[in-house]
Amino acid sequence: MHPNAFCDMPKAVERICRAIDNKENILIYGDFDADGVTSTSVLVKTFEYLGGVVDYYIPDRDAEGHGLNSKALVKLLSQKKPKLIITVDNGISSVEEVKFINSFGRDVIITDHHEAPDEVPPAYAIINPKAMNALDEKLTPLQIEYLTSLAGVGVAFKVAQAVLEKYNKLSYSYEILPFVTVGTIADLVPLIGENRYFVTKGLELIANGKHYGLKRLLDSAGVNIDNGLTSEQVAFTIAPRINASGRIESVDPAVKLLISDNKQEIDLSIMQLENLNKIRQQMVSQTFEEANTEWINSKSKDNAIVLANPNWHVGIIGIVASKFVENYYKPTFIMTYSEETKTYRCSARGVKELNIYDIITNISDKLDGYGGHQLAGGFTFTTEKASFEDIKKALNQTVDEMLNGKKLSPSLDVDMELSIDEVDTSLVENISKLEPFGMSNPSPTFVVNNLTLKQKKLMGSTKEHLKLTVETPNGTMDCVWWSRGDVPLLVGDKLDIAFAPQINVFNGVTSVQLVLKDVHADGLQEAEEVKQKVYDHRKKTNILTQVNDYIKGSEKITSVFAENRDIIESLKPYKYIFESIVNRVNAHKSDVLMFFDYPAEDDIMQSIMQKVAPDAIHYMNYNQKIHGEEGILKTFSGMIKYTCTTLNGEFNITRAASALGVTNDVIETLLEMFEDVQMIRITNRDENIFNLEFINSVELSKILHTSKYSEYTELMNTINEYKNKYMTMEVQV
């Protein structure tokens, strides 16, 4: 669609061209998310290409927030002396700020895509498809829908196209189209009309190496694009890394990645983005854990989740809110607070039944600023206007009124039920013809019923993802379930799965992998319904005799979990405690479960809880010696020798892991490490049984210098952190 579909476009182009020709200072005022960063880059690169004098400014998320900021403008007007300021992905609500700029005799062009208020800024030109009278009245309803679906970067691209056309250099639009692709995908706008073209063509350009920085960023993230690039790969690799810079620190590395022509500067930007993304992941994990504990301990029955903490970083509270919606399916409002300014800042995420922007608008009389759309929004308020409790009460009242007694329940639209043997590479190839996928064109969701879970592993730096292996008539198939590492599934469970299939290439081998969207398992349903009584004895001392007497006199079946050898040995004097000890292998149904020791990972904890299914849980604080890495190596060496001389080399992974109080991953790593130093040869690997052949004894010092040793110590650190968590975490009693 021609850019002149925007009524103010000719006026905007005339002013921009005048600024370029007269070498006036042009300032692009952007935003700190991926849409804002790519929008900024589109206009900066275009105006530089045309010979313009252009600079950019992106506000600090924490100090300045979204949109034009008066304090920032004072500095910019005095230091950069722009004659023309162009906003991208913001500005439509900045009435007073534009008046302020106008008072200095400077011109402002607003390019934005957010909902427009009744009063719009007195700008030189406004390019926003959602503003009143902004579009040509001759447009059809479908054309209007396409334009109002543009992301901020799509609107900026329209301006760039119009200016390039004026200079007869429209072919340059292909140089900036990759930016439009990234911003459009990241901002979750509907992939209809021109958005679909932007994404389809841009993915092709990026995959073909059109933009060095984006190609290098994909390489850094480990994304193989030999067979092309998908919208999902952009959404889960490029977009989070660009967003991380604006969330955590300065957004400059993200902008430089896109606009720089210096390969060294681009590579440095990628290193910075990767580091910021890791920090962002850690912050999200920690903040969600804190917020979730607070929510659980509150025992709230509210239909909205409203939480605040001055220590939560404003840059990641939106992601945390999204995780709450995924877990609880309730509209969620996560806030941080500044004591210095007496201001609360909130990021909100919604559910499809309730419009989050409408909820916020309903309490706007208590707010200093707000914005948003159907599923996401945000606001600020000072304690002079309202207290946190006032806002919490108002939000819940609004949600209750909108629900009118209805219960919120998540649902998943399924396209087709298949048998597992119908899920193959040809299915994925046929589905790929419908790409690119995104809003208004989701990837198809399929269902396969009655599968058997063969293997389960946790993935990710914080073990937040699940990798499952299910049995098929022709072998097995791998599945991944992002951000659901907490789901208590067990090997052997019968599963009904909803998924999207994709091609996975690993070590040159191509296979089908299922990206799970939901799972039904009978055992899972039973686990969710179990409500146990919890008792916290971790601050108590000298209670072993009392506990021993309790078990002796109780009619209830009691299990005592302990795998640590020192703990087991020290419990021997207490007959009834000692006789009640179980581990991950022999755990059985009991009325009461006592933890004198803690499992090595969440997967083991869930397995024990399902096997024992207790009515009551007792957490004990028992001084355990967490064995050092070298101590375990010596013990493990003895286990290997015993296996090879007495058990014909048949090594049981799970039993060994239980005996040492570690994970199966640790045992497998140890076996590979001992094979590397030629102490053993692994002659056969089954799911849980490795066959070993002893070669000769090896000095411990030789083992300590293997490449696998650092992997082993990292796994042990993770185990120790997990066990320590149970020693210190808050327990809901």
Q: What do these predicted ranges mean?
A:
Residues 31-32, 59-62, 90-91, 113-116, ...:
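Short, ordered loop/turn segments at secondary-structure junctions
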Residues 82, 104-107, 612-617:
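A short helix->loop->beta-strand "cap" motif at the edges of active sites that frequently abuts
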Residues 594-629:
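Long, low-complexity, charged/polar intrinsically disordered regions in eukaryotic proteins
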Residues 1-84, 103-105, 122, 140-141, ...:
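Hydrophobic helix-and-loop "lid/oligomerization" segment in the mid-to-C-terminal part
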Residues 42, 122-169, 173-185, 607, ...:
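Short alpha-helices
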Residues 88-150:
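Histidine/acidic-residue-rich, glycine-tolerant segments that coordinate divalent metal ions
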Residues 25-27, 83-86, 559, 591-594:
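Structural motif
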Residues 48, 53, 196-291, 349-352, ...:
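Acidic, two-metal ion nucleic-acid-processing modules in DNA metabolism proteins
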